[in-house]
Amino acid sequence: VNLAVALLTFSFTLAVLTLNPYQILLAYYMTGIRNINVDVIISSAIIAIMANIYKESNIITRLSNALLTTIKKVWLTISLIPALFGLLPVAGGALMSAPLVSEISKRINLDSNKAAYVNIWFRHLIAPIYPLTQVIILTSALSGFNAAQIALYNIPLALVMYAVGFIPVRKELRNTSVGVVRESISNLLYIIPLLVAVFIVVLGVNIITAVLLGLISLIVLVRPSKSLLLKSTFNKDVVMIILTTYAALSVREVLMLSGFPELFTSLFTDLPSTFLTVSIIVISMLLGFVLGIPTGALAITVPLITNVTHSIGLVSLTLMLTYLSYMISPSHLCLVLTLKFFKVDLHSIYKYLLSTTFLTFILMVITYLILFPFL
């Protein structure tokens, strides 16, 4: 089932059960005109257009090879390639890095199961620390915290994820080097549009302005043909990003109008806030796994978390743990496409994915308890 349809069905069902007809209309109207929602929807569409230009012009492959030309360490090479493609926040994006990961895996005798694991795990390191991904933009809109702030808080947790990710493949990575397709260093310039957008977001400038300037700089650098530009802009992926973002935000509007966050909190008034917070995080993780998408889960649970405590640390932890549960979901599109590309089954990759996910979960919670009280 299409994610946008699923989210709209959920929000409409919830609206019918909790709101009167006027409030239902108001919820969907406010979803489309509330300033912060408009920012999220438009910026997500612009980012999708940028991703299409990078993909259709083959710039992302040239950029990857240019960055890797001087890198000889296997562990850096094989983790960096899927991570670089993670800069393109598109559905099923792991399929873009799969051919390169497969090629390197053959050179170091990494079997298909582990190659598929590497492609999934390291592909998803970027999103939680990259302010231009939909998951951070949406979490920022729902929590009220700056996107760059959330990304910075996620870095320690993402580093835990990065380190743990090497455990299943540590034996194969004993090789010290691997060859890559050499590219001119001038191709490194193509990373500038991404850096421009991120830098402007970090400065606290409106997200639409930031990604629009990133898009303009990308067009200036790439000089795409008119047909490529039109193909990248008027693309079904862009439309689906807009619809999915609107649908996710509509869940929040319905929840707010229904008074559900306050009602949910009041049910646990006699219980410690810690218990309530843990309950919400667990619910968020379960939703991430069931839905196979983090934004759908976070659209429901971030408003609940911020209603209990206005803590960016807890918002960050909720995002990361939800993201982990989504990553291993059988309905996760990147996982499905990776399994298909490498011709492996879910059970084979779960041998590595579940154990590293569980260990990462434990270490993330420990990192939060030790480090975040001082941030």
List the model feature ranges, each with a label:
Residues 10-14, 82, 122-123, 156-161, ...:
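Transmembrane alpha-helical core residues of multi-pass small-molecule transporters
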Residues 73-153, 293-320:
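Hydrophobic transmembrane alpha-helices that form the pore/transport pathway of multi-pass ion
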Residues 36-44, 146-162, 207-211, 276-279, ...:
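Alpha-helical transmembrane segments
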Residues 1-42, 165-263, 368-375:
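Hydrophobic transmembrane alpha-helices of multi-pass small-molecule transporters
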Residues 291, 321-328:
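Transmembrane helix-bundle signature of multi-pass secondary active exporters and lipid flippases
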